[in-house]
Curated annotation (Swiss-Prot):
Catalyzes the isomerization between 2-isopropylmalate and 3-isopropylmalate, via the formation of 2-isopropylmaleate. The gene is leuD. Transmembrane segments: none annotated. The lineage of its organism: Bacteria, Pseudomonadati, Pseudomonadota, Alphaproteobacteria, Rhodospirillales. Pathway: Amino-acid biosynthesis; L-leucine biosynthesis; L-leucine from 3-methyl-2-oxobutanoate: step 2/4. The keyword Nucleus does not apply. The keyword Transmembrane helix does not apply. It comes from Paramagnetospirillum magneticum (strain ATCC 700264 / AMB-1) (Magnetospirillum magneticum). This is 3-isopropylmalate dehydratase small subunit. InterPro entries: 3-IsopropMal_deHydase_ssu, Aconitase/3IPM_dehydase_swvl, AconitaseA/IPMdHydase_ssu_swvl, IPMI_Swivel, LeuD.
Length: 201
């Protein structure tokens, strides 16, 4: 998993509340088990018409936000059915940080497991970032995970909280497999010890 230390990029505003996982990545795109290739279908039913043409007014179709790295969203983001494809699609598009007043628990946890930093902030601070994000290509925001600080286009800063263990994993690029491999020697030693103490297993 790619490390997350400091992220600087355009922030895209999506102030809708209750954006569910089917809106993030519709069910017809869940057949794949690959983490790549889903970015083009992120928010598919909002980004495209039924005949596949781009909806020009949708935020990620606007020239200023096509390369957005940060998404500033509304409350209860990622609600609905559990699907890990949702953070896969967000990450494959190029977004590595989602900021919102609240998240659905499963989506929130899945983000950390896939190298995406979800940040919960009070509504008034999210509103400030939404105002900043509406500047288009001038909406350059920096997220410093080590310092736990967001810096807006005007130089103002906002502190945020993050679980220390999840912070450690993101800073070091550790997913569940990476964490397991860190303990490979201890796992091997345990297996050898068990063979001796319990050979019938």
């Amino acid at each position: 998993m790619e490390k997350f230390t400091t992220l600087t990029g355009v922030a895209a505003p999506l102030p809708m509340i209750n954006v569910d996982t089917d809106m993030i990545i519709p069910k017809q795109f869940l057949k794949t088990i690959k983490r790549t290739g889903l970015g083009k279908n992120l928010f598919d039913e909002m980004r495209y018409t039924q005949d596949g043409k781009e909806v020009p007014d949708f935020v990620l179709n606007k020239p200023a936000y096509r390369s957005a790295k940060i998404l500033v969203a509304g409350a209860n983001f990622g609600c609905g059915s559990s699907r890990e494809h949702a953070p896969w699609a967000i990450g494959d598009f190029g977004i590595r940080c989602v900021i919102a007043p609240s998240f659905a628990d499963i989506f929130f946890n899945n983000c950390f497991k896939n190298g995406i930093l979800p940040i919960k902030l009070p509504q008034e601070q999210v509103d400030k970032l939404l105002d900043d994000a509406n500047r288009g290509s001038n909406a350059i925001v920096t997220v410093d995970l080590a310092r736990q600080v967001i810096t807006g286009p005007d130089g103002g800063s906002i502190s945020f909280e993050v679980d220390p263990f999840r912070k450690h994993c993101l800073l070091n690029g550790l997913d569940d497999i990476g964490l397991t491999l860190q303990r490979e020697d201890k796992i091997a030693a345990f297996e050898e010890s068990r063979k001796t103490s319990s050979p019938w297993l």
